[in-house]
Amino acid sequence: MRIDVISLFPEFIAQCAAFGVVGRAQERGLLELQGWNPREHAQGNYRRVDDRPFGGGPGMVMLIEPLRACLETVQAADTRPAPVIYLSPQGRPLTQALARELAQLPRMVLLCGRYEGVDERFLAQAVEMEISIGDYVLSGGELGAAVLVDVVARLQDGVLNDAESAAQDSFEGPQGLLDCPHYSHPATHAWGDVPDVLRSGNHAAIARWRRKQSLGRTWLRRPDLLDEAGLEKNDRRLLDEFRRELAPDDEK
């Protein structure tokens, strides 16, 4: 997959993507990441990329022409069709389901805004989709782009050492539940012991425990994700069991 990022700070994206899963994806040739600075396409001695908004008001607005020229160069560098995605608090919320859709694309172009945003005419003519990583405002779209690059990169075949890691993540699967708790060594610690079932070697019992914990954790922490009416009978039974086992003082 190829991801082109249009940003006034392309080095920021490159640094974020140099480590961990995204860095591994690039090393393995599974992800190509390229940054583009619209300032290089601006005119004049100062290479200005922003100006005051019509109608007055605070802040500056990113200009059409540097962005248009930059995008033209990006599209000429690789002729494969690619949606232009603007990182914006007004966009469609980024979910795991949307990430899976985007991960199937051969290429996409990410646009990072700054200041008060981007001239609306550029957005109307050049942008296919706006995506938000949350209901808050950042100084620019670079952090949002870094998040999107990471979530899409880890879904590429061959990036994770164990493909099951992605399949068992929170929000994965047809029902999009939260993940169950995980434990490692030591089995006994001053802060608690690993549940006996996870050390039993009984794979059926372990799978049942993990499913119950996943259902229960979703019910406790993200009830908006849990459509109880759509749960299978066995899942409803497990959730009821989880509720019965939950001590009153554990309910937060």
Swiss-Prot record:
Protein name according to UniProt: tRNA (guanine-N(1)-)-methyltransferase
InterPro entries: Alpha/beta_knot_MTases, tRNA_m1G_MeTrfase_C_sf, tRNA_m1G_MeTrfase_TrmD, tRNA_m1G_MTases_N, tRNA_MeTrfase_TRMD/TRM10
Keyword terms of this UniProt record: Cytoplasm, Methyltransferase, S-adenosyl-L-methionine, Transferase, tRNA processing
Subunit structure: Homodimer.
Annotated residues for binding of S-adenosyl-L-methionine: G113, I133, G134, D135, Y136, V137, L138
Gene Ontology molecular-function annotations: tRNA (guanine(37)-N1)-methyltransferase activity
Enzyme Commission number, as recorded: 2.1.1.228
Listed Pfam families: tRNA_m1G_MT
Location of the protein in the cell: Cytoplasm
Function, in words: Specifically methylates guanosine-37 in various tRNAs.
Keyword Cytoplasm: yes
Gene name linked to the record: trmD
Family recorded in the similarity comment: Belongs to the RNA methyltransferase TrmD family.
Database matches in CDD domains: TrmD-like (cd18080)
Enzyme class: transferase
Catalytic reaction(s) noted: guanosine(37) in tRNA + S-adenosyl-L-methionine = N(1)-methylguanosine(37) in tRNA + S-adenosyl-L-homocysteine + H(+)
Lineage: Bacteria, Pseudomonadati, Pseudomonadota, Gammaproteobacteria, Lysobacterales
Any single biological process term in GO: tRNA N1-guanine methylation
Species: Xanthomonas euvesicatoria pv. vesicatoria (strain 85-10) (Xanthomonas campestris pv. vesicatoria)
Domain of life: Bacteria
Disulfide bonds: none
One cellular component (GO) term of this entry: cytosol
